[in-house]
């Protein structure tokens, strides 16, 4: 019986789908100038890995069981990250190097697996693990047990107000500056800021440290710290949007100062994408997607406070601030991938980093619920329902205002192609502005035009060729 082989030809839609998904999940570096840093060195890496493993396995003293366990875990994480560099996708970013973002994705996978492991332990085992990591946690106390909140709110003095400008106020300001760089929308940033204060009110019966004086919550938090950070972040966004990005090869720069400057600029975005979460023609699915984005954002913020309250470690402990920094780093590619999924009709699935981030958020919440059953048994269901309703109302109101403003006062023709990436998209070493209403089909023509135009300029990013 003859066997018939049929050649399967991908349709144009399939090709576009794969191209669009690859742009956010496996961004490629274009116009590579120093081949050594981007060529695979798998054999060399394997050799170094095996030799280092042999060295640590046979030269160290294995008489201390505790030290054996710590060193073993450290090497396990290290070699998993080596595999991450070899096998995991780049994600949407390529600056300063794709390997950095593969390691970030590898760390997020490790944290996800760690949360899965934690969920299947009992409370005594979790506490024993925490005490093994840091014996000083045996003496840690909840902040709610040693501090008072929202006391004497009618007493308003300059001394009391100035006393609130501490390291946490600075972290609020700086944190909102970074959030604005990620979200790039005044409307969404202000909505998240306001709804978070409402979230604190609705969950105050569970977490006493959510209780704040009205002037602390409204003036210091919303207006000064959050508002100042949003303004700073959006100002930086506008500045980066107006720049024209032409990247010169470091080989074409002859001065030592120019080479050093180009090397430093490798740690800056390759381009900056104009972001528009909603427009007058947005579908209901897109609106609901933004609402889901708000819910997950609030859930991630809530996890920060519930984790340190249930597992009893202070805000200044390494477990707290390391998690905050880590979540902040993986949020960057997550938001980029979710934005592409939400706004690009050709992108039919979320990126892998976005998927892992969502799983982490829900696993953290699940761990809090499992090990904080005494706390959550006091939950007022009515408050939670009202919180969801208020969050939905404020979100939809904000979205309506954003669409109305864009329709009446927004730019008519201004838009940029999403063929590059930065904190949102980086397409490589040669970038510029491309006209169009987020039409990724024009990516090829835009990139060709950019490379042709960049060749006519003798000065690139302030460096003479």
Curated annotation (Swiss-Prot):
This is Phosphatidylserine synthase 1. Residues 446-465 are annotated as: Disordered. The lineage of its organism: Eukaryota, Metazoa, Chordata, Craniata, Vertebrata. The gene is ptdss1. The chain crosses the membrane at residues 36-56, 71-91, 103-123, 287-307, 310-330, 356-376, 381-401. Its EC number is 2.7.8.29. Coiled coil: none annotated. It comes from Danio rerio. GO terms for biological process: phosphatidylserine biosynthetic process. One of its GO terms (cellular component) is endoplasmic reticulum membrane. Pathway: Phospholipid metabolism; phosphatidylserine biosynthesis. GO terms for molecular function: L-serine-phosphatidylcholine phosphatidyltransferase activity; L-serine-phosphatidylethanolamine phosphatidyltransferase activity. Belongs to the phosphatidyl serine synthase family. The keyword Nucleotide-binding does not apply. Keywords: Endoplasmic reticulum, Lipid biosynthesis, Lipid metabolism, Membrane, Phospholipid biosynthesis, Phospholipid metabolism, Transferase, Transmembrane, Transmembrane helix.
């Amino acid at each position: 019986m003859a066997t018939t082989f049929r050649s399967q030809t991908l349709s144009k839609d399939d090709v576009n789908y794969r191209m669009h998904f690859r742009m956010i999940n496996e961004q490629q570096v274009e116009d590579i100038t120093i081949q050594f840093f981007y060529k695979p060195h798998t054999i060399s890496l394997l050799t170094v890995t095996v030799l280092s493993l042999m060295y640590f396995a046979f030269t160290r003293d294995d008489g201390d069981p505790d030290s054996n366990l710590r060193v073993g875990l450290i090497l396990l994480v290290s070699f998993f990250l080596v595999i991450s560099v070899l096998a995991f996708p780049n994600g949407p970013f390529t600056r300063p190097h794709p390997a950095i973002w593969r390691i970030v994705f590898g760390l997020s996978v490790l944290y996800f697996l760690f949360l899965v492991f934690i969920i299947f332990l009992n409370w005594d085992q979790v506490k024993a693990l925490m005490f093994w990591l840091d014996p000083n946690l045996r003496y840690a106390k909840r902040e709610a047990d040693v501090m008072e909140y929202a006391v004497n709110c009618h007493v308003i003095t300059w001394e009391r107000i100035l006393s609130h400008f501490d390291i946490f106020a600075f972290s609020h300001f700086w944190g909102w500056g970074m959030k604005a760089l990620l979200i790039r929308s005044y409307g969404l940033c202000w909505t998240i800021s306001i709804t978070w204060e409402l979230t604190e009110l609705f969950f105050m019966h569970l977490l006493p440290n959510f209780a704040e004086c009205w002037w602390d919550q409204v003036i210091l938090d919303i207006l000064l710290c959050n508002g100042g950070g949003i303004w700073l972040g959006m100002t930086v966004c506008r500045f980066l949007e107006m720049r024209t990005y032409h990247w010169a090869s470091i080989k074409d720069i002859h001065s030592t100062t120019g080479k050093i400057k180009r090397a430093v600029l490798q740690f800056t975005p390759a381009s900056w994408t104009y972001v528009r979460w909603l427009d007058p023609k947005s579908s209901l699915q897109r609106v609901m997607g933004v609402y889901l984005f708000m819910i997950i954002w609030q859930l991630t913020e809530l996890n920060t406070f519930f984790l340190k309250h249930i597992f009893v470690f202070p805000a200044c402990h390494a477990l707290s601030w390391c998690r905050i920094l880590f979540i902040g780093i993986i949020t960057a590619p997550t938001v980029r991938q979710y934005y592409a999924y939400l706004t690009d009709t050709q992108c039919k699935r979320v990126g892998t980093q976005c998927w892992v981030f969502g799983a982490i958020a829900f696993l953290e919440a699940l761990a809090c619920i499992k090990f904080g059953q005494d706390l959550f048994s006091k939950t007022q269901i009515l408050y939670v329902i009202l919180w969801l309703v208020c969050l939905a109302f404020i979100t939809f109101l904000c979205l309506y205002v954003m669409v109305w403003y864009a329709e009446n006062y927004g730019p008519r023709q201004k838009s940029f192609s999403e063929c590059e990436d930065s904190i949102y998209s980086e397409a490589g070493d040669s970038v510029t502005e491309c006209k169009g209403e987020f039409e990724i089909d024009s990516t090829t023509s835009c990139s060709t035009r950019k490379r042709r135009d960049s060749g006519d300029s003798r000065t690139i990013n302030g460096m003479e060729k």
